[in-house]
Amino acid sequence: MIPMTTEKKKLCLSLLGIFFVIFILNSLMARSAGDDYVYSFMWEGHSMYEPLSADARRIAGFSDIAVSAWSYFLTWGGRIVAQAMAMFFLWMPRGVFNVAIALTVVLLVLLMQWTARGGKVTMELPAKSVLITGFFLWAFQANFCGIFIWLDGSCNYLWPMVFLLAWLLPYIRHYMTDGEARYGGWLSPLLFLLGLLAGNGNENTLCWIGLFGLFYLYHIYKKGEMQLWMLAGFAGLSIGYGFLMLAPGNLVRMEESGESFRLFQFSVKAFVAIWFHTMLLSPFYFYLMKAFRKRRELCAISGGRKYVRLSLWFLSASLLFEIIMCLSPEFPFRSLFPSTIFCLTAALLMQHAADRAGASPVRLPGAGVMKRLATLYFAFTFAMTFWIFVENARWFDHWLGEAEAMRGTPAILSITERPPYEEELWTYLTGFHHYAVGLKSDPAHWGNAAMARFYDIGGE
């Protein structure tokens, strides 16, 4: 047995800490969102915003997931990978999801670190850098719970981003090594599969990735360096994206909801979302601006110019992911997650290049004080978040007991009190890690009806 070095132990402890933060919060999460009840049932082929029928059937196996996902594809939307994953996790005990999402967040941190090192997959990572990346994910998310806690939200945003970053790694490594990186025949089928999964992710992300990918493949073709795995990966991405955008259900959904994608469609909500997101990421924009001004120092190291260009590409893609959302009829904060990850990755790329060059793009007085403040911020917001999650879980368990007692009867569960700590103040005290319980006051609401079907009690 090879003994672990001190640095490896620190790295393992850092990754374990990130794992447990996500695992603990998810273990306290109540199934309160209407979506998480709806996707527990076979898809019935009608609008999601119509209550489930009285004879709705729970998903009970992989064949049910396949049939339900296909029905969803035909009648509601193209995100069949995300919704099939949600159906799987909702069929499984909650503990399976809690472990899976915690491991996925750890993998996300590693993928961001590997990307920052030019696509090199290695466990020779500084524990400090890993912890800082984890802190960035905690402190600079526009909708933390919608990505890392809510089951259906994570399947729609977190997992597609992990698939995409994993898919990008070989292309990034190829670029950074001037084509010297070589892979076995195993990469082609693996990258094709990753492409299928990543391509069926988020609409505002994949359109730009596909466009940039076409330009890069054409550039490689002109240089005579085209390899089979490059074509296989892009073919998988294209097929996945085709299923996403050309799903018959997209047209059905737009017709039933009265929504459409139009040029120059800009609402106050979209403006507020972009403004808030810009303010949230402003430290990284400032850092990148200062780093680009010192690009001559960074370009002096081996491969430095490529790091600068790759960072600029990630930053450009981040902004494009955000801007194109102005065409969308909906602009939830969670849709900005891909933009956030690409911006953070751009900063990590420049930081790694600066470390190698011995440069410091930003000299901050009192850096030690800032580290202590960051530690204090995390400790305080995590403690507040943990406490509120515990209180919400207690509140929900009380009413869940009432629902279980009524199971199999026509009695209607009447929730007479709202969850504790719903005021806006608690959102700020948790650092925007507070989640809203999805149950509504309207008994006929589709989410309430889905909950009633789930516990086999009376409802609209």
Spans of features found by a protein language model:
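Short, Lys/Arg-rich, polar N-terminal cytosolic tail immediately upstream
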Residues: 1-6
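Intrinsically disordered, polar/acidic, low-complexity terminal segments
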Residues: 7-76, 90-110, 117-124, 371-460
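Alpha-helical transmembrane segments
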Residues: 10-23, 128-135, 233-238, 316
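Transmembrane catalytic cores of multi-pass membrane glycosyltransferases
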Residues: 27-99, 151, 187, 194-319, ...
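Transmembrane alpha-helical segments
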Residues: 105-116, 163-175, 210-218, 283-288, ...
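Membrane-interface micro-motifs in multi-pass membrane enzymes
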Residues: 125-175, 275-279, 319-350
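Membrane-interface transmembrane helices that cradle and orient dolichyl/undecaprenyl
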Residues: 164-186, 223-224
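Signature aromatic-anchored transmembrane alpha helix within multi-pass, membrane-resident enzymes
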Residues: 187-188, 296-311, 355-383
